[in-house]
Regions:
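N-terminal membrane-anchoring alpha-helices
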Residues: 2-8, 12, 16-17, 22-94
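Active-site beta->alpha N-cap acidic-glycine motif
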Residues: 82-169, 180-183, 187
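C-terminal domain-boundary segment and adjacent tail
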Residues: 82-100, 128-129, 142, 264-302
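A cross-domain feature marking catalytic cores of carbohydrate-active enzymes
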Residues: 109-111, 136-138, 160-162, 200-203, ...
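Acidic-and-aromatic substrate-binding clefts and catalytic sites of carbohydrate-active enzymes
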Residues: 112-116, 136-144, 167-175, 200-208, ...
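A short acidic, helix-capping loop that chelates divalent metal ions and anchors anionic groups
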Residues: 165-172, 260-264
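His/Asp/Glu-enriched short active-site or ligand-binding loop at hydrolase and phosphoryl-transfer sites
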Residues: 205, 211-247, 286-297
Length: 302
């Protein structure tokens, strides 16, 4: 199996261990295998600050304003890191494909499956001979298992986007996070016949408890390089411009087959956006692949 690291770390050769950094564990383990959690320097620093503040309160009670101020600042920094979807401060986060991907890009499609939109998206992908990664919601997969089966049958990958896509996901504690993610893992494995290797948080928002949970479940966090905001924007041209501005090799793109915005004709915007993006990618010799094919090729059949 080739071992690769995110864009934020130096390229390594197969069989080597990448160096530790804020976005890569000291001992890299490919997606699909449980790994030992190692807190990032940012999380370690925050924990040390908490210990220092507590020690200060015991030794010098008069310095309580400093201690409280330090704790508030630390908590605000942790919250800010969780509200930044592409941040690597809280742990490993794939924001781009590894260097070994060459001129490949990853098209990721979130919040489905949707019985109206997903089949039409699959038809478009077939037309352009493109492969995509579908981050599916467990509850929706249970309601529309035929869509999940079609995704896999047509050569695409199904990954974990939580069981219920809870809007308070980033506020959950470790046990609730694990229940939510593990439930989706079981649901999607049962329906697709393949165990998800990657997880994407609802809206990309998370907290420091997420990375240890993903380590136990053998999942890696994946966000994106650029997104179109196609659940809010009804103008397909504007969505396309956001996705294509600066598009290059190894980019991870985000669009939606679930809850897509609709244009003036009441058509899902994504159906107008995809042909433009796929044609532009082909014109610049960029080929769409799945996350697992680019990052964990040895685990494609996991």
């Amino acid at each position: 199996m080739n071992r690769t690291t995110p864009r934020t770390t130096p390229r390594t050769t197969p069989g080597t261990t990448p160096p530790a950094s804020s976005s890569s564990p000291a001992s890299y383990v490919a997606p699909g295998a449980a790994r030992r959690w190692k807190p990032s320097p940012f999380v370690t620093g925050s924990a040390a600050l908490h210990v220092g503040a507590a020690a200060t309160l015991v030794a010098q009670p008069a310095l309580w304003p400093w201690a409280v101020g330090s704790l508030v600042t630390s908590h605000l920094a942790l919250v800010a890191a969780g509200l930044w979807p592409r941040s690597t401060l809280l742990g490993l986060n794939w924001t781009a494909l590894p260097e070994s991907a060459g001129r490949q890009i990853a098209l990721t499609i979130d919040d489905g499956p949707d019985p109206e939109v997903t089949p039409r998206v699959l038809d478009l992908l077939d037309r352009y001979d493109a492969r995509a990664t579908f981050f599916c919601i467990g509850d929706r997969a249970l309601r529309h298992p035929h869509c999940v089966e079609a995704i896999v049958a047509r050569g695409h990958a199904v990954e974990n986007h939580s069981q219920r896509h809870r809007h308070n996901f980033s506020l959950l504690g470790p046990r609730a996070l694990e229940r939510e993610i593990a439930a989706a893992q079981q649901t999607l494995t049962d329906i697709s016949g393949s165990r998800p290797l990657f997880f994407r948080a609802p809206a990309g928002l998370r907290n420091p408890f997420l990375e240890p949970v993903l380590c136990r479940l053998g999942l890696h966090l994946a966000s994106w390089t650029r997104r179109g905001f196609d659940t809010r924007t009804r103008d397909a041209t504007l969505v396309t411009q956001r996705l294509l501005r600066g598009l290059g090799p190894r980019d991870i793109l985000l669009v939606h087959d679930g809850n897509p915005a609709r244009d003036a004709r009441n058509q899902p915007v994504v159906l107008d956006v995809l042909p433009r993006v796929l044609e532009a990618a082909a014109a610049t010799q960029l080929r769409c692949t799945t996350l697992r094919a680019a990052i964990a090729p040895g685990a494609e059949d996991a």
